[in-house]
């Protein structure tokens, strides 16, 4: 009886722990390389940068290249305990003698990174926890929704109550959901889906858009006005050293 009760308590405790909100501070970083320098950036990340990030308390979440990469871009997501930890980690990283040596050697034949874009994010409770795709050779889709003023809560409610499970119905795997941290204006919804391929993604989206259940949910949620103003989508292929495959 004692063993049984202990087991029940463990299960309950695990369930409560699993439902705790993810309070980490996330950063989506996009590096745009000079022509011909993307391979050098990938090599530097794979051989050195990711390890030095971890050394300074930064968690490597995932690394990808766009499937259509006309801007020589590399996308990655880092996680930190909080904003203050992020600042300390980057300051320590920038001052690290090992990093300085790595950077100097890798740029002996020229600069690598032309521009950097950062998006700071909080985890959204749309999805209880960030997942890893179940299959191999996945294609990821990074989607960013800009809502009409004051309509982000409506979008989040629709995702929680309907969209999430309708994506799964059409074989789109929910991986991670975030809301952006903006200096001004409304946050954006940023999320990652996994597909078997871009072709399968196209089939899934076509089926999703004509699904009567989705149409009914969308129309009901928009009775008092449209929700989404703009949608941006980028297909990404994970790099070999990415934790998210």
Question: Which residues does each predicted region cover?
Answer:
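Bacterial Sec-dependent N-terminal signal peptides
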Residues: 1-22
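Short S/T/G/P-rich N-terminal loop/turn motif that feeds into the first structured element of a domain
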Residues: 18-216, 220-245
């Amino acid at each position: 009886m004692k063993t049984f009760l202990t087991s029940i308590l463990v299960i309950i405790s695990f369930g409560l722990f699993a439902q705790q909100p993810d309070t980490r501070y996330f950063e989506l970083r996009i590096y745009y390389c000079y022509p011909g320098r993307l391979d050098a950036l990938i090599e530097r990340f794979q051989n050195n940068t990711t390890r030095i990030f971890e050394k300074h308390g930064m968690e490597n979440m995932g690394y990808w290249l766009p499937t259509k990469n006309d801007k020589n871009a590399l996308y990655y997501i880092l996680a930190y305990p909080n904003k203050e930890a992020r600042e300390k980690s980057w300051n320590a990283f920038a001052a690290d003698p090992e990093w300085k040596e790595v950077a100097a050697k890798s740029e002996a034949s020229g600069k690598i990174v032309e521009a950097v874009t950062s998006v700071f994010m909080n985890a959204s409770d749309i999805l209880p926890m960030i997942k890893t795709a179940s299959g191999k050779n996945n294609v990821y889709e990074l989607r960013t929704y800009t809502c009409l003023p004051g309509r982000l809560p409506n979008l989040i409610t629709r995702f929680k109550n309907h969209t999430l499970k309708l994506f799964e119905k059409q074989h789109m795997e929910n991986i991670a959901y975030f809301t952006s941290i903006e200096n001004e204006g409304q946050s954006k919804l940023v999320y990652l889906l996994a597909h078997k391929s871009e072709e399968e993604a196209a089939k899934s989206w076509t089926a999703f858009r004509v699904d009567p259940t989705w149409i009914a949910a969308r129309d009901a949620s928009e009775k008092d006005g449209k929700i989404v103003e703009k949608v941006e989508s980028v297909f990404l292929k994970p790099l070999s050293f990415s934790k998210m495959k």
